UniProtKB/Swiss-Prot annotation:
Belongs to the PNP synthase family. It comes from Pectobacterium atrosepticum (strain SCRI 1043 / ATCC BAA-672). GO terms for molecular function: pyridoxine 5'-phosphate synthase activity. The lineage of its organism: Bacteria, Pseudomonadati, Pseudomonadota, Gammaproteobacteria, Enterobacterales. GO terms for cellular component: cytosol. This is Pyridoxine 5'-phosphate synthase.
Amino acid sequence: MAELLLGVNIDHIATLRNARGTPYPDPVQAAFVAEQAGADGITVHLREDRRHITDRDVRILRETLQTRMNLEMAVTEEMLNIACEVKPHFCCLVPEKRQEVTTEGGLDVAGQQEKIDNAVARLSQANILVSLFIDADKRQIDAAVASGAAYIEIHTGAYADAPDDETRQHEFERIRDAATYAAAKGLKVNAGHGLTYHNVLPIAALPEMHELNIGHAIIGRAVISGLKDAVAEMKSLMREARR
């Protein structure tokens, strides 16, 4: 079985930075650390409201990443222009609502086929690989195939947020069946949204999966796992100042 790739989403490094309007923590530095730790790619979502990642972040990351850049974006003229200028390795087209905390569902490709087809064609002409963030639904997979996109990313939110084991198993089976169906149609299959250290194993075990994009859980774990060293370093500096 081929190696499963990990795309690390660093949006919430920028969320923490922007909460205080400081230049730190720096998403570019975080991307470097993630790459050194084994990340196969870095994912960022340039939202229309710029609530975390900024245009400047995107441009610097494109110049400095040693792996691959996956730019998540809404299907708007502004974002298409930015993508065609910056030329990330991948663009993942996602739905976007300004009032949402995070992306709440998959892109309705079938319901806006012409718009998605045109976006995929435009990005492809700029030599950017395109992925469509969709729910585990055969109708959406068929629409993704028709669009000309090479990749889909299956939205795993319903699986991750399932209130009980029975519901989670049902959602897992939907993802499994969708992955099998999509792979048979010639699509490369990624997945992401809500994946954590506690629920990732069944998804990672699916042979059709090419890459998982995970962010919030990794950044949350990093805050806790790195807290001991961070506190100790600050205390050491304070002691040094009094010597």
